[in-house]
Swiss-Prot record:
Its main location: cytoplasm. This is Protein spindle-F. Residues 9-26 have a biased composition (Low complexity). In pupal bristles, localizes to the bristle tip throughout the elongation period (at protein level). One of its GO terms (cellular component) is dendrite. Disruption phenotype: Mutant females produce a ventralized eggshell. A fraction of eggs are fertilized and the resulting embryos have a variety of pattern abnormalities. In mutant ovaries, grk RNA is mislocalized during mid-oogenesis and grk protein levels are reduced. Defects in microtubule organization around the oocyte nucleus. Bristles are considerably shorter and thicker than normal and have an altered morphology and growth direction. Actin bundles are poorly oriented in mutant bristles. A zinc finger (UBZ1-type) spans 310-336.
């Protein structure tokens, strides 16, 4: 990398001395592009040399193995060890060849990514820079076109690297891969104060996860509302049972039987004592005749029936007794509307999610 930078320095100095109208940012961008292109060319040359040497060795080993297989049987016993060693070498070289092909594919992918990033940097710089003259405008409107110099033709001889020594040839491809430079704070534009290009990745699974979470919350809410309604119905049932249960005094009266002087006839004393006890316990009704008491009881029964008719749910037809408060009856009626609102809300949320997903797919 340093050698390539040293080679490109005279070119950059000559371009700056020629009196061009490029801004400092465009000069830095051009310098970075030249450095990247020179690095890619040198790497391709090294890989081509290594592939050629491996092919030559493979060819030599194939010829040697074919000669050893075509020899007479008299010499087979003496050269068995050599044949086995040659076959082992052939298999090892084949493995190395496959490894090199994988590394070549990796480097080509890295070069493609590097080229896209450099083209994006050039486009951003051209959009941000203000045109100073017509020449600068024409230069900014030009798109970065990929050259076929080092793919179809031999590279420039003035830019070639010197021949490597035998010790340097044994370097692995991992030492020259671009992945080693990925841990730095900035990528290629770091030494030249260029902006780092951020890769925007779409996350289509985010909408699916959000929809799943909303569905789960809706199910939990629906279950909680259902449990609340069941608890309220149980509470109303208990209230009705408590209201219908007689008071302890009335229960004692029904249990207590009148005294019998004879097994068949009741005594007047027992009846009079019962009436006195009843009148002493119900002091509020001492001055009212029995007919008036019967009328009051009938009116209460009619009022309870009217209240029961008034407390009939218009949605499900459930009836509530007079002992149930009006607030409980109102909450039961409101529950029907809350359930309908929840269903509408869930349907609208699902429609919005599908609409969001369709827009996201269309924009992509």
């Amino acid at each position: 990398m340093e050698a390539s930078a040293a080679k490109i320095t005279p070119m950059a100095s000559s371009m700056s001395a020629s009196g061009s109208t490029n801004s400092p940012s465009s000069e830095k961008m051009n310098y970075a592009l030249q450095v990247a292109l020179q690095t890619i060319k040198e790497r391709c040359i090294q890989l081509q040399r290594r592939v050629a040497s491996m092919e030559e060795e493979n060819q030599q080993l194939r010829e040697a193995s074919s000669r050893s297989e075509g020899a007479p049987r008299a010499n087979e016993i003496g050269v068995t060890g050599d044949v086995l060693s040659l076959k082992a070498q052939v298999s090892e070289l084949q493995r190395q060849k496959e490894q090199l092909e994988e590394h070549i594919g990796m480097v080509s992918n890295e070069n493609r990514r590097l080229w896209s990033r450099l083209s994006q940097i050039s486009k951003d710089q051209q959009l941000n820079a203000l045109p100073s003259s017509t020449d600068s405008r024409a230069q900014q409107n030009q798109n970065l076109v990929r050259s076929k110099t080092f793919t179809q033709h031999s590279p420039n001889p003035h830019l070639r690297q010197k021949m490597l020594s035998d010790g340097i040839k044994d370097l692995s491809l991992e030492e020259i891969a671009l992945d080693d430079f990925g841990a730095s704070s900035e990528e290629l534009g770091y030494p030249y104060n260029l902006q780092k290009v951020e890769e925007t990745t779409s996350e289509p699974d985010a909408n699916v996860d959000a929809k799943r979470c909303l569905d789960g919350l809706q199910e939990l809410r629906r279950e909680a509302m259902k449990q609340q309604q069941e608890l309220r119905s149980v509470m109303t049932l208990l209230e009705n049972r408590i209201a219908l249960k007689p008071c302890p005094e009335c229960a004692q009266k029904t249990i207590k039987k009148p005294e019998m002087a004879d097994k068949s006839l009741e005594t007047d004393d027992s009846l009079t004592s019962e009436l006195k006890n009843y009148e002493s316990q119900h002091n509020g009704h001492n001055g009212t005749p029995p007919s008036q008491r019967i009328n009051i009881i009938q009116e209460k029964i009619k009022a309870d029936a009217a209240d029961a008719m008034e407390k009939t749910c218009p949605m499900c037809g459930k009836q509530y007794s007079s002992q149930v408060s009006f607030n409980a009856f109102r909450e039961h009626v409101e529950m029907h509307f809350i359930d309908d609102a929840l269903e509408l809300e869930s349907e609208n949320s699902i429609e919005r999610q599908f609409e969001f997903v369709s827009h996201a797919v269309g924009d992509f």
